[in-house]
């Protein structure tokens, strides 16, 4: 019997975790956990940064990331650059760059995070940033 080709996962069926950087996360799809049925080089997660909070400065060593902001407003910090972001903003974050997202708005920042190659715990590290 052939395996189902259509894969469907609902956000609310995904476990809520707190990521290393403090972001509230639901991993939607990651070949590391979801097995070899997916021919993907990336992972995708749904993330939230609550009002008044900031993710901890961190970097991915080998992977790049793309954030797509669904809701909320804030400041995206990548190395020495800072830009305002809001719904519809897409941010590319190269490997080995220090990054964090600061919620400056009145609602949660909700975004999708795509990591390529797919996210692995040994590829992420916290970084101390001088104020």
Please report, for each region that a protein language model flagged, where it lies by residue.
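A short, N-terminal "cap"/entry segment at the start of jelly-roll beta-barrel domains
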Residues: 1-41, 126-131
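Conserved short histidine dyad/triad with adjacent acidic residue
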Residues: 29-33, 45-60
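Short histidine-centered beta-strand/loop micro-motifs
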Residues: 36-39, 55-60, 102-104
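Histidine-centered metal-chelating micro-motifs
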Residues: 54-56, 75, 91, 95-101
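Glycine- and acidic-residue-biased ligand/ion/polar-headgroup-sensing regions
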Residues: 62-64, 69-74
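Structural motif
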Residues: 73-75, 82, 98, 108
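Short acidic-glycine-tyrosine-enriched beta hairpin
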Residues: 80-95
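Ligand-binding loop in jelly-roll beta-barrel domains
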Residues: 95-121
């Amino acid at each position: 019997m052939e395996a189902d080709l259509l894969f469907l996962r609902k956000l609310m069926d995904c476990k809520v975790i707190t990521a290393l950087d403090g972001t509230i996360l639901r991993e939607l799809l990651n070949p590391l956990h979801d097995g070899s049925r997916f021919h993907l080089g990336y992972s995708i997660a749904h993330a939230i940064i609550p009002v008044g909070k900031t993710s901890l400065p961190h970097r991915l060593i080998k992977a790049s990331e793309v954030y797509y902001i669904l809701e909320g407003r804030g400041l995206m910090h990548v190395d020495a650059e800072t830009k305002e972001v809001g719904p519809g903003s897409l941010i590319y974050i190269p490997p080995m760059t220090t990054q964090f997202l600061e919620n400056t708005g009145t609602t949660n920042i909700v975004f999708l995070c795509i990591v390529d190659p797919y996210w692995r715990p040994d590829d992420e590290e916290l970084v101390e940033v001088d104020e």
